[in-house]
Amino acid sequence: MAARGSGPRALRLLLLVQLVAGRCGLAGAAGGAQRGLSEPSSIAKHEDSLLKDLFQDYERWVRPVEHLNDKIKIKFGLAISQLVDVDEKNQLMTTNVWLKQEWIDVKLRWNPDDYGGIKVIRVPSDSVWTPDIVLFDNADGRFEGTSTKTVIRYNGTVTWTPPANYKSSCTIDVTFFPFDLQNCSMKFGSWTYDGSQVDIILEDQDVDKRDFFDNGEWEIVSATGSKGNRTDSCCWYPYVTYSFVIKRLPLFYTLFLIIPCIGLSFLTVLVFYLPSNEGEKICLCTSVLVSLTVFLLVIEEIIPSSSKVIPLIGEYLVFTMIFVTLSIMVTVFAINIHHRSSSTHNAMAPLVRKIFLHTLPKLLCMRSHVDRYFTQKEETESGSGPKSSRNTLEAALDSIRYITRHIMKENDVREVVEDWKFIAQVLDRMFLWTFLFVSIVGSLGLFVPVIYKWANILIPVHIGNANK
């Protein structure tokens, strides 16, 4: 009986042990899972606790220093992402930049061991003290950058890199437009603090261009920064100036402005290649003059209205317009000479005959004109011959003499007209070569030195690019 009773009791004891072991296993698994989920939650709680402790008595309007005479040193740097536009008319330079600023905030320090090993936090810039560094030479009323988050380290180092879109004033020198080189500057400094309270330290002399997006019209030759101080009767104010030396890419203006202007100036030369009796000579000159006026108006819309300097292309257009005006005057004079005759003008002077009928044609490679004036003419009447005994013969001779004199007179008139026409041709040929020479020399003299100087500007390798 005792043996039979001990068997069921042992079985029940074994089942009880397995049930307890299973429950303990489930409880352990649940506890492990709960411990695994509690770790991120504890990090968030640590960061919440850190922020509450840091900003419980924090006042963002108060300069974060321990003593009144302590100064905050701001490490300042500039990175450019895009040169958006250079407005020559309004003398503005539009840029997208990043303002790199770093300083020590003694009120934002903590021990990472007390907050779960947290060493870096990110808070909005509106929640902490930030230096009021602005762009002094801004032209659109926006002096500050965009509000972004700051990166704060456990030792109190605050890093703030806000992006900004600036329209800064820039004095544009259009003397060598479109082969010009501009120097635009951006001046940064504190708006209210003097140097004894906030000092600016230049982080890097060169502007960071690692993320720069190329512009289709302008190329940055150099972008460097320098520190300066402005003093008045009581205080000194530090500032940082970044100078951007930019070079224009003139391909667009060369194709659509300079080459058409040069072509129009050479069209003026072709006016003198037309025959002197063609009235289209004046029409061609007038059309060229109107076209140059249109180009001058186009340039006036691009460049600023200034009386200090005259742009190179403007000088060339004015030179060409004077050139065309002179060609119109010369053409009118040549047409007038072409239509002269003995009945409208006096006899041609011997010096004019010698120069324009003999000397100049040889120099201009023209076919020599027949010398009708320096050839000795035979006397038509050598004296009184023997009297004819017949009256009919004398009458016939008188008639022949009359006809001969009339024909010779007509020939002389025709020769005078042809001589004037030939002089007009000589003038056209002379001014053709003269204007062609002046056009070539003037174009080369104006553009070649400037283009050579522009082409030899070296683009230095930027430090930021070298460190990529």
UniProtKB/Swiss-Prot annotation:
Residues 23-254, 452-468 are extracellular. The chain crosses the membrane at residues 255-275, 282-302, 317-337, 430-451. Activated by a myriad of ligands such as acetylcholine, cytisine, nicotine, choline and epibatidine. Residues 338-429 are cytoplasmic. One of its GO terms (biological process) is presynaptic modulation of chemical synaptic transmission. It comes from the Eukaryota. It is a multi-pass membrane protein. The keyword Transferase does not apply. Residues 1-22 form the signal peptide. GO terms for molecular function: acetylcholine receptor activity; acetylcholine-gated monoatomic cation-selective channel activity; ligand-gated monoatomic ion channel activity. GO terms for cellular component: acetylcholine-gated channel complex; cation channel complex; cholinergic synapse; dopaminergic synapse; neuron projection; neurotransmitter receptor complex; plasma membrane; postsynaptic membrane. The keyword Glycoprotein applies. Belongs to the ligand-gated ion channel (TC 1.A.9) family. Acetylcholine receptor (TC 1.A.9.1) subfamily. Alpha-5/CHRNA5 sub-subfamily. Neuronal AChR that forms heteropentamers composed of two different type of subunits: alpha and non-alpha (beta). CHRNA5/alpha-5 subunit is only able to form functional nAChRs when co-assembled with another alpha subunit, can be combined to CHRNA4/alpha-4 or CHRNA3/alpha-3 and CHRNB4/beta-4 or CHRNB2/beta-2 to give rise to functional receptors. Interacts with LYPD6. Component of neuronal acetylcholine receptors (nAChRs) that function as pentameric, ligand-gated cation channels with high calcium permeability among other activities. nAChRs are excitatory neurotrasnmitter receptors formed by a collection of nAChR subunits known to mediate synaptic transmission in the nervous system and the neuromuscular junction. Each nAchR subunit confers differential attributes to channel properties, including activation, deactivation and desensitization kinetics, pH sensitivity, cation permeability, and binding to allosteric modulators. This is Neuronal acetylcholine receptor subunit alpha-5.
